[in-house]
């Protein structure tokens, strides 16, 4: 309720104006890039990830249904959250994310949305299977058109 004044039926002059654009399924960006949504769960909250050609970005989840997993198979690059080693109510653990990455079979998976509790970058990367790595500040991923 911190910013509830923004959502009042009669807006107050000078407050931010929001144009809602609900997205679901497949849509095109203003630059004509096709994007597909992936419905995932963040504890009890439905959230979405995105697929851009053979690249997917799913960074706030702890559950993905079997039907939505199908959308994530055959990717070149998957970016997935892996918060820490210990269980968490709304995020994949390192072990859960690793198992999911193996199941989905992307050519390269990067884990992101990690806490300091996951361990040292170099140590964790040494534990991960080939094709799965921790993301890092400044990582750049080239996406095909």
Describe each PLM feature range:
Residues 65-145:
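Binuclear metal-ion centers of metallo-dependent hydrolases, dominated by the metallo-beta-lactamase
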Residues 44-46, 64-67:
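A short, acidic/glycine-rich surface segment
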